[in-house]
């Protein structure tokens, strides 16, 4: 089935939850879809489609990640079975680690309401980050879950200029709509956050954009904001450089230079954070991503305060 330029491919999954490691407030990840229609040019997750059927791949670099969307039609059923196992450890689940759970396909397949009902049944703590306000459709379910378990609702907001956002995140909604969505969830018992990640060198790292994001974050009463500069690895690196060359050719050579060592130039990164830190103070914003988790679970978890939350 086609939606815009995307092909939807229903499938059944053998498991719903997958273990993750690292400095995160969750130990398990759940992806309702494989692939993402948001089409973000900086997406780190395009690699994940290389494991899908090769005859259904299109683009050489993205492997069809943006336009071949696998729909896990039985995911809620599998999730319920996994959470019902004796001795299952009740730890926070991140919903949508390598896709947006509320991308356009969700408007048609409506898998998330059943996922949320399963989470309510088992009183499971969850985290959701989305670039869509379709999540408001499920407001009542999320509100109910937030009253019996830890819930964190976040949105990636890194571009406030709409003309630029439409080029870089063509399938997402505007920053204004994302802020509005977060403000509505502030009425629940969920914690809310803004993920300004990635910050794009030469495009979104200017003071005007940062001020707009930070002031918006303050206005909606977000519990935290986290920043991370752009990492370019694997297929993402070539996809992003090709995008810059086509859309912003005047920036191409400088962008290549900034990533000449395989990562963002350290001095450039230092200058950015030197600009951003005073603005965080100005708007009295917390960058402690883990604080809501500590508040919910106590200090016996492996949590620590982060400074600007850049993974380096």
Regions found by a protein language model. Give the residues of each.
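Conserved Radical SAM active-site core
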Residues: 1-154, 158-166, 175-180
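Generic structural signal for hydrophobic
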Residues: 119, 182-185, 217
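Active-site glycine- and acidic-residue-rich loops that bind
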Residues: 133-136, 200-211
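Conserved strand-turn element in the central/C-terminal portion of the radical SAM core barrel
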Residues: 160-162, 169-171, 184-206, 230-232
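Auxiliary Fe-S-binding modules of radical SAM enzymes
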Residues: 1-12, 18-19, 207-312
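Surface-exposed amphipathic alpha-helices with a cationic face
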Residues: 143-146, 182-187, 277, 281
């Amino acid at each position: 089935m086609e939606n815009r330029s995307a092909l939807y491919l229903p499938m059944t999954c053998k498991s719903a939850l997958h273990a993750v490691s690292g400095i995160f407030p969750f130990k398990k990840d759940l992806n309702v879809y494989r692939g993402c229609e948001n089409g973000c040019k900086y997406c780190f997750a395009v690699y994940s489609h290389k494991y899908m059927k090769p005859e259904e791949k299109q683009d050489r670099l993205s492997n069809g990640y943006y336009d071949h969307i696998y729909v896990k039609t039985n995911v809620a059923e599998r999730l319920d079975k996994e959470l019902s196992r004796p001795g299952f450890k009740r730890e926070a689940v991140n919903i949508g680690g390598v896709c947006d759970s509320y991308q356009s396909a969700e408007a048609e397949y409506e898998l998330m309401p059943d996922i949320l009902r399963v989470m309510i049944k088992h009183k499971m703590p969850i985290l959701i980050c989305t670039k869509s306000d379709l999540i408001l459709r499920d407001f009542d379910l999320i509100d109910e879950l937030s009253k019996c378990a830890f819930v964190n609702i976040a949105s990636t907001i890194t571009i406030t200029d709409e003309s630029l956002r439409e080029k870089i995140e063509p399938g997402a909604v505007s920053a204004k709509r994302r802020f509005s969505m977060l403000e509505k969830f502030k009425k629940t018992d969920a914690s809310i956050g803004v993920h300004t990640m990635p910050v794009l060198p030469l495009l979104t790292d200017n003071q005007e954009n940062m001020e707009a994001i930070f002031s918006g974050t303050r206005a909606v009463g977000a519990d935290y904001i986290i920043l991370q500069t752009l990492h370019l690895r694997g297929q993402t690196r070539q996809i992003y450089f090709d995008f810059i060359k086509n859309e912003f050719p005047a920036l191409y050579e400088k962008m290549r230079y900034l990533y000449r060592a395989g990562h963002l130039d350290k001095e450039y990164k230092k200058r950015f954070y030197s600009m951003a830190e005073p603005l965080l103070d100005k708007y009295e914003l917390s960058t402690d991503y883990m604080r809501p988790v500590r508040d919910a679970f106590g200090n016996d978890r492996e949590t620590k305060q982060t400074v600007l939350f850049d993974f380096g």
